[in-house]
Amino acid sequence: GKDAIENHFDRSLELQIVLERQGKQEQLREIERISELASFSYIRQKEPLGLGHAILVAKALVGNEPFAVLLGDDIIDAEDPCLAQMISAFERYQSSIIAVQQVSRKETSSYGIIDPKPVEDTIYQILDLVEKPSPAAAPSDLAIVGRYILTPEIFDALEQTPQDEGGEVQLTNGLRVLLRTQTMYGLAFHGCRYDAGSKLGFLKATLQFALKRPDLAPELRDYLKMLSLGEVGATMERDRKEN
């Protein structure tokens, strides 16, 4: 549940005492490091009324400052973090920045798609946004990914945004309202995105990041090689018979 997020970035006195007694200094240092990454505040969206509504719930906390929105379903692996790339673009343009990624035409109906005007190598001025268009109706193949840097004007725009047929306030619709008064940019970031909202995407992300860990990678690679050679089933069957 949502408590797991808060607990992950908090300290557990009971756990720290256990780790200290067991002499597990490395694990102890790790949980202390995580709790010091930033100062965290939490606001809950009491009803599932859309991403735009969720952002509105945070209005009092954000105040009159630009802020970032990161959706957990999108996991991005990049040497230069995606958000760092976006902050660099924001510092140049001083306007809302949306992360975008090229997708195949047949996938446009699964994403918000921008109508782009090229500005520089990876930067596009956004002329319009269309939510989940058919391949024929899509203005481009540049899809919105779950990373945004938004200016506080988005709050007024969201308050002017009508609910959709499902009773939700959609961020894409709010961004279209904001486009009336603000130039907005899309950044085609450098990095690999995984859709953790799908089972396969979640598995791919888990494997990719596990293969980057020195404590897991060697044995995991061996296991994956066994899978590719069809040896795992035979090994499991042999172990079953022996037991």
Residue ranges and their predicted role:
Residues 5-13:
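Glycine-rich loop at the start of a catalytic domain that most often binds anionic cofactors/ligands
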Residues 14-18, 25, 31-116, 150-152, ...:
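Conserved beta-loop-beta/alpha segment of the NTase-like Rossmann-fold superfamily
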